[in-house]
């Protein structure tokens, strides 16, 4: 089974996501790994900086701008009302989650959670797009199988075991995103 990784520029717009979808839907089973859409991680770092400086108003302003950008991507990516709605609900959920960190203490742990949202959003968007196109795909959120050890290094034994379980559970899917 192939593992294909696409960086932020490759999935930086709705059109680019559609092009990636064409590349990965060749009928061969594969795992697809996506970065956050171009510019997203930098913006999430900016949001985190505002939160470290205890400036929730500044953070919320940037969050709102990024959410608006994603709403536009949803509108451009999906053709059907059903998937546009799913996409909008996805965006709302993630951005509400990011906003929840503007109300409380912000530490390195919270920063890592905020920074992970870009990849989580792009992979979920791609999975919905593939489903809308009739491609059998399954979303495997990295947070379900990634774990670090006491030194904050990846725990390869755990990751391998849980990843294998996920792969076996979804043997009939053409693409695992």
Task: Describe the function of each predicted region.
Residues 1-177:
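Nucleotide/pyrophosphate-binding catalytic subdomain
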